[in-house]
Amino acid sequence: MLRSFSGAGKCKCRIPVSRQPVCGRSLRISSTLTPWNQSRRAASTVTSLDSFPNVGEKLHGFTVQEKKHVPELHLTAVRLKHDKTDADYLHVAREDKNNVFGIGFKTNPPDATGVPHILEHTTLCGSEKYPIRDPFFKMLPRSLSNFMNAFTSADHTTYPFATTNRQDFQNLLSVYLDATLHPLLKEEDFRQEGWRLGPEDPRSILTQGEQSKGNLQSEDVVFKGVVYNEMKGQISDANYLYYIKYRESICPSLNNSGGDPQYITDLTHQQLVDFSKRNYHPSNAKILTYGDMPLSVHLKQIGEVLDGFEKGQADTDVKLPLDLSRGPLNVTVPGPIDTFASEDKQYKTSTSWYMGDTTDVVETFSVGILSSLLLDGYGSPMYRALIEGGLGSSFTPNTGLDSSGRVPIFSVGLTGVSEADAPKVKSTIKRVFEESLSSGFNDEKVQGFLHQLELALRHKTANFGIGVMEKTLSSWFNGSNPMKELSWNEVIDEFKKKYEQGGYLESLMQKYLMNDNCLTFTMVGTPSYNKDLDDQEMVRKEKKLSELVERHGSVEQAVSALAEEELQLLKIQEEAQNADLSCLPSLRVEDISREKERKPVRESKMDDIDVVWREAPTNGLTYFQALNSFEELPDDLRLLLPLFNDCIMRLGTGDKTMEQWEDLIKLKTGGITTSTLHTSSPTELGKFREGLQFSGYALDNNIPDMLQILTTLVTETDFTSPHAPAMIQELLRMTTNGALDAVAGSGHRYALNAAAAGLSRSFWVQEQQSGLAQLQATANLLRDAESSPERLAELIDKLRLIQSFAISKGSGLRVRMVCEPSSASQNEIVLQKWLAGLPRNRSPTSPLDHTSVNSVANRVFYDLPYKVYYSGLAMQTVPFIDPSSAPLSVLSQLLTHKYLHPEIREKGGAYGAGASNGPIKGFFAFTSYRDPNPVNSLKVFQNSGIFARDRAWSDRELAEAKLGIFQGLDAPMSVDEEGARYFMSGVTHEMDQRWREQVLDVTAKDVNEVAQKFLVEGSRQSICLLGEKKDWADSDDWEVRKLSMNASGEPVIDPLSQDGAVASA
């Protein structure tokens, strides 16, 4: 998996968005040192410093270098080095049963062929101890892990997992260590995962006979490979493309680790093997373990593997960015057109400065605060000057402080900029610097950020260990001490000391930003960009074919040879599906408890409002959630709910600007959110609730303030202020700008939502709230608002109407509180008072109109400028309490691992494919992701029912499917999520317990029967594809649609009509 383009350790771009108000063989002990007495461990707690060996002591071939207790994070960290290989090791002990392992290697890419990324994939395709094909994916259903992945970052590659089961941990540890240190790296795996040339549909050769190979033409040959198609998908995301081209410009010595499709096809198998030998060695590794398992157990198992190696050469080369000390640099590159932006605003431009050295942990923390002060929130000076000032529509993806490398880089930029305004962006940024330096920074804002850090330390998350790994690895690989990264209080205290002396943040600004030593990077939307990529790919293909023709003598023989290679790969893939997997370790279904852990809640009534309480250890925090559901909401108002949520966190009230509200939110809360609500009934198919939900958390004593802030923002946001119309248009631009990139990142989900919209009104409503229909409606709103003051006024009137009933006392309101038992009584008093002050208004209603659902086409193709495809197929099934629900979930796991993965990913080259059962929503789904051949994938989807019905499922296969379900079902839960399932959907503990038992008791016969009933006989199916339209989309009854500011032909709701009528955009 390619690491997110923002990079580990990256302070992500702080774009003010809706619902976001703020923003690791034998025991060898030297006789000259005191052996570590393991018996001391048994009498101590997990994090007691005395329970760990002292500095200089040895254990299982490792020597302790540092150890430290970090009370604010309730952990103890021990840093060790493996004596024989010099492998670095960090153990983080914490009272957390969700244990984590990670091993990473420094992998500076030598070029842009993506060798680190392709190696990450092929490393997981078989090893010496586990010589089966693809043990990584084979382990997914043999484990109860709640996190299992691999990441290629800019300069290192990491293989992490997390699980609460200790035997599972040791199983996965064995597989991960052997995969990374003893990979097979077979050439056929390189061809499957990396790249190859071959006939687009080799299955046709099998169906038409061997003689058909001679009929293949050069046009039938295409580039294939999982990573190749993944990266084609990545560059379809203009945000990713902008970021990666920016990184190539500012740090040209650090090549594209993910791989540029233009260069991936230059990589050879031998180059991959050589890169692995150089880099995947313990001497070049960083290892991290986290959790409550004993350190000695880890060291024994890991040490036995590392002792099989001799000391090698570590890659300590830290790639540095360009030298900017001689003055400014400017780089301009072409990019794709954003069809959701105006034709005259196709520029993306940013300017970047260096901010010191990340090994200075305190200063890096301090410049992070400085970055937040300049960029966070609607009231930030950069937002006001750049976006509110009308120069662009949103921040560029590199905006913020990037501390993933040795040199922190601070960038500010805008998308949706006109050619004339592009030069003004930098000058405006510099003006903001000058004004901020002159006026200084408001102490209240700094205290607000520090308060947020205090709450972050108190907040108990389920994935804390993975967060520790992500926080430490990037800087560790670039020379920082990970122990310092974990010392939160020391860093904060040192910052406070410097800050209290006065002028500290301003001095950092003067030191790093008040100069012209910067790089300005600009991407210009070019109409021919995507066609140019296609042409370049064709040239590369012709060059490869010419080389093959020289070798084979003719085009026909060259293409026939490629077909033969493809058939050989297909044969290997087919054989792998029936391989003996007995060498792989596995948990058993018997390891799963039949009893669901009970998280008791209590219910009360206050003023006729249902309140659900969950009392649990929360470190002095109280979490609040309220749902306000609306019955039969008019369609035109529904489409405006997301925009209403945006407005609540943007417009401000009569007596306070949004900047003032943001400061108060940071000082008094951990954040408040508003969002749309859509939940399904577990007992009745198609029954659902929609509306708005509100949530937040704060220290117990700040809950009254938090509730007051929330209520005031919802009920008193000033839609009538002179600034409101411009702000609303600004919000619409932010949503539409980059909408295509948002879809590309989760294209399979958007395709599935659009497909499901034709199944029932519930799914149709969901699509209107959060799917492609919502994106197009938003674009239409922007178009109308910019062209017609009258339409903008109508929009504001409807937003004010929503405000009148958004949060009100009535049958639709429900509340959930999570707090310490000792805080419950005081919170009851506070809540009672808050409820008493709410207005009592009902939402307007309209008769249910099912024509909108019935008119949705069963086969929809969205013509979008992507180089790969995303597909979704949906069918309605049964509610959660139906006996068929559990076997349908087992069926989805079986199809994913035993049919769809080998057919669509391994053979078809898609990055991903799977089946899923939505037990609460009552639908069964198929999806593919970054898929080069969606037509074939749809055939596989449609053949799945017969495959599952006719297969004699083994006990082992059933057990694996059940383990896969319980990975999610029994995954650790953050304290604020406890009780949420019952509160949101009405799923009781007894319902969950019954479903759990039904899953555990599913038989092969049950699976065959639900496959026949729902997939073969089945009810109505709906399909949606996203991607570049090809000739085949003109047939097969596809309804072709577009998404853009000027889309036409698809039926959309007009949110500004009087009755929410369906119209043509």
Swiss-Prot record:
GO molecular function annotation: ATP-dependent peptidase activity; metalloendopeptidase activity; zinc ion binding
Query: Where, by residue number, is the active site?
Result: E120, E193
Provide the E.C. number(s) assigned to this enzyme. Answer: 3.4.24.-
Q: Where is the transit peptide?
A: 1-42
On assembly, the entry states: Monomer and homodimer; homodimerization is induced by binding of the substrate.
Q: Name the UniProt key words of this record, in alphabetical order.
A: Hydrolase, Metal-binding, Metalloprotease, Mitochondrion, Protease, Transit peptide, Zinc
Predominant location of this chain? mitochondrion
Q: Which family does it belong to?
A: Belongs to the peptidase M16 family. PreP subfamily.
Return the GO cellular component terms, semicolon-separated: mitochondrial intermembrane space; mitochondrial matrix
What PANTHER family does the record point to? PRESEQUENCE PROTEASE, PRESEQUENCE PROTEASE, MITOCHONDRIAL
What enzyme category does the UniProt record give?
Answer: hydrolase
Entry's localization field: Mitochondrion intermembrane space; Mitochondrion matrix
Binding residues for Zn(2+): H117, H121, E230
UniProt-listed InterPro entries: Metalloenz_LuxS/M16, Pept_M16_N, Peptidase_M16_C, Peptidase_M16C_assoc, PreP_C
How is the cofactor bound here? Binds 1 zinc ion per subunit.
Its function, per the record, reads: Degrades mitochondrial transit peptides after their cleavage in the intermembrane space or in the matrix, and presequence peptides; clearance of these peptides is required to keep the presequence processing machinery running. Preferentially cleaves the N-terminal side of paired basic amino acid residues. Also degrades other unstructured peptides. May function as an ATP-dependent peptidase as opposed to a metalloendopeptidase.
Species of provenance: Aspergillus fumigatus (strain ATCC MYA-4609 / CBS 101355 / FGSC A1100 / Af293)
Q: Which cofactors are named for this entry?
A: Zn(2+)
UniProt name for this protein: Presequence protease, mitochondrial
